[in-house]
Amino acid sequence: LEPALDRFAQQFAAPLFTAELVDRERNAVHSEFSAKKMEDGRRFYSVKKATSNPEHAFHQFAVGNLTTLENTDDNPLRPDLIEFWKARYSANLMTLAVYGPQPLDTLETMVQTRFGAIENRNRQQRTHSASLLEADVLPAKVTAEAIKDVRSLSLSFPIPSQRENYRTKPTSYIANLLGHEGPGSLFDVLKKNGLADSLSAGIGMDTGENATLDISIALTPEGLSRHDEILPLVFRYIDIVREQGISQQRFEEMQRLAQIDFRFREQGEPVQEAMRLSSQLQDYPADDILSAPWLMERYAPDQYRNILSRLTPDNVMVYLLAPQPGLKNPNLTQWYETPWQIEPLNAEALQTKAPGALAKALELPLPNPFVPENLAMVPGKTMDKPELLGNHEGMAIWFARDTRFNTPKANVFFSLRTPAARISARSHVLTRLLVDSINNNLNAWAYSARLAGLDYSIYPHLRGVTVRVGGYSDKLHTLMNRILMQVATPEVTRQRFDIARQNLIDSLQNKAKDRPVEQTSEFIQTALLEDTWSTEEKLLAAREVTLDELMSFAEALLSEVDPVLMVHGNITEAYALNLAQQIDAIVLGKSDFAPVERSRVRKLPAEEMLVSLSVEHPDTGYTLYTQGKTTSFEERSRFRLLAQIISSPFYEEIRTTRQLGYIVYATPFEMLETPALGFVVQSPTASQEAIDQAVREFTDGFENTLGNVSEERLEREKQAVISGLMERDRHLGEISERYWREIDRGADGFDSREKLAKAVKAVSLEELKTTFRNSVLNRDRALRVVTGGEGLSANKARDLILQQPPVTAK
């Protein structure tokens, strides 16, 4: 930690602003701008900036490119940077959080001796008194054009800053009701009528002087065509909250859940914790820094009403984002060239035109039945690893009692491995649509469980479908039972089928507009993994499947199964066995056992294969994947260690020195224990041939670097890999996920990371050099996937790879 703090503090105390490095970073900023220019999130954000108050700082461009960061003899950039640093970087305006294992006194000394050098220039905090949105423009609707098939409706209401109300959180109280997804909620009514896929509510922005409360709705195609009906419905629901939603009981429920969540808050990644704390120090007093996000100290009805008084039809900016919205003579945002237009709204119409049948269905949530009551720890010691309790009618039952974090939580994983899910691209699509139906049917009922600290996910995978339920163990069984009933007899409706199928088609079509390196990497995964299919194959299947076919598939999915159950955490063995009986009775009663083997990775041909993809993006994408010979721990350890040693020099050479792009990295590219290295570059300027030439020149030079690695350096790099592998678990979920991965790969000893760490420790420099020479220099078993230029087509390459045997398992 100390050497890192030495370097970190000097960046702020005495930055050099070396002219050459300033220009390099200028190019890096431009590369990032270019790489993300086609992303709808950034493009839509630029529309929000363009339609905000020109007098507010938010209106300004906040990314940077070669034009805005001009660096010429007449207008050099370095003096402006130095002036900016002197004006803005003053100790009295800065906050710092250091997170480490050392005692507090030691950490304090580390900080004072290093960060004390940052000058206190007694600068005043900059304020932005202008409103975020111009009052005389409201109410208005902004329509913007999306590149991808995305449809959203957002309402943004100017409200006073809420930073001083962090102890009472009136916006959290109101947003909890507006964003609720339970029966009768705004979202539930919209979803049941096929108009929306998701809804969220909360603070959009808070500058300290003013803020916005935002309601964001992801629309279905039907919702897009009827968005003018949705707006009055939103205001009708706000009226219901205003009339009926303010109550002591609701506050006490929210307060109780916040207290429980704070009491049993799980530790996050150290870097994320430090970032969160340093940021919150800008908003909260130091004494409250740990508890501030969870504080709800008192019932504050006047504050709730004050917020609600701003949520009116005459005080709203509505944003509609859609592909090809039919704009006439649109404006274009300055840097992202996003088409948009603005038009006034009729506030009176928004208040009076709510569709009658939909408005009558709206109601506020009932008391939450999932609020945990029993928060005690189960008796017994934490088990070292899961134990196999037996096989119940073909279902493997794994159990591990674990109370090491003193939190009354548990995680349950239940995998329905089934041959039906992996037959074809069509069965893959049907599995996804079936999972969507199950999730859709559960959402309204289970939303209260999410609010009460219970979480669940139901997701398709290579061998079938997995149900994961986790959180406070007290009422976990209630949620699990309802989920099992839906899995056993899912309700599939025509409306939901049509929406889910269209969402899947949109998602698959949008992949053609992903970043180039996302497309190159995805090609590698779908071409090499058994039981996966190309986007084109899945898209064709999605367009053809029918509702009748899905209903038949729902029955076929459970006809043959290879089920696995794991129960882990603050829970008893008796519960695990009882749950297994429940699963058997509800889900597996008519199922036959059929083993479903794990998928494998296909072996690449001996010589490098070059594949060229056609993408809808101006940047060049490049991914070089070099595959190991076997899945042995020894081979995996060599690739892990090689990635550790090569990643920083590769980044330094390709991104920093050669300035080829913003997205540059070398990384382990392991799939299903098959080791590999990945070299990834996305460039706004270089061709795929130029990128490959640069990569070859780098790897040629790196051979000497690797040959000169000292024994001391090698041991240091090994320790870095081992430390990453053996990093201490911070919360129950991390352990559950690791156990579940071990069960999936059949590693009943639950010691894969220990074996891999041992193998890393044993790697010799000669072994490392041989692996580098064969895999990186000679490119044995290499797959280079690029955008543009020469190469095999995706279909031709996939056909060749499909003929290959799997990588040797050891």
Put a short name on every predicted segment.
Residues L1-Q11, R42-N71, L93-Y99, V150-S161, ...:
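M16 family metallopeptidases and their MPP-like homologs
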Residues E108-Q124, L579-A594:
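Glycine-centered hinge/linker elements that transmit conformational signals in sensory
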Residues D302-T312, K328-T338:
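Long, low-complexity, charged/polar intrinsically disordered accessory regions
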Residues R26-N27, G41, R78-T113, L547-I583, ...:
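Non-catalytic, conformational "gating/processing" segments within enzyme and secreted inhibitor domains
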Residues L21, R26-S34, E39-D80, F84-A91, ...:
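Hydrophobic, small-residue-rich alpha-helical packing segments that form membrane-like cores
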Residues S34, R123-P183, V271-A292, A322-Q324, ...:
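His/Glu-based metal-binding/catalytic segments typifying zinc-dependent metallopeptidases
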Residues A13, H30, D80-I82, V137-A140, ...:
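Short alpha-helical segments and helix-capping/turn motifs at coil-helix boundaries
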Residues K761-K810:
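In a subset of proteins, long, contiguous C-terminal domains/tails are tracked
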